[in-house]
Swiss-Prot record:
Gene (UniProt): ftrB
Lineage per the UniProt record: Eukaryota, Rhodophyta, Bangiophyceae, Bangiales, Bangiaceae
Necessary cofactors: [4Fe-4S] cluster
Localization (cell): Plastid, Chloroplast
Free-text remark on how the cofactor is bound: Binds 1 [4Fe-4S] cluster.
GO MF assignments: 4 iron, 4 sulfur cluster binding; electron transfer activity; metal ion binding; oxidoreductase activity, acting on iron-sulfur proteins as donors
Pfam families per record: FeThRed_B
Chain's role: Catalytic subunit of the ferredoxin-thioredoxin reductase (FTR), which catalyzes the two-electron reduction of thioredoxins by the electrons provided by reduced ferredoxin.
Keywords associated with the record: 4Fe-4S, Chloroplast, Disulfide bond, Iron, Iron-sulfur, Metal-binding, Oxidoreductase, Plastid, Redox-active center
Name of the protein in question: Ferredoxin-thioredoxin reductase, catalytic chain
Marked site (Increases the nucleophilicity of the active site Cys) residue numbers: H88
SUPFAM superfamilies tied to this protein: Ferredoxin thioredoxin reductase (FTR), catalytic beta chain (SSF57662)
Cysteines engaged in disulfide bonds, as pairs: C59-C89
Keyword Plastid recorded: yes
Amino acid sequence: MKKQNLVSFPENLEAMRKFSETYAKRTGTFFCIDSSVTAVVIEGLARHKDQYGAPLCPCRHYEDKKAEISATYWNCPCVPMRERRECHCMLFLTPDNEFASDLQEIDKTTLTEQIS
């Protein structure tokens, strides 16, 4: 599959980091206590955005990623997250989730260290 080189991967990574922070704050959700989970999910969203032009949920298997992107159901934030605040990836956790931290931000250094 041909890569869309509209924006470089580092720019998409930063865009997904900012999106994740903003969305967590807006929805009153929190990142996982294990920052590597948060980092890997943000990286996956950025890679899908880089490859396909959309932040398709990286925690699921798809037979046809382009079809899934067109359907929009699993584009982040996915329908289960928007409707029920259920994030399969554990990126956005409700405060009562045993794996939720008290963080709604992840700095660039932590993100980069966790995915290198």
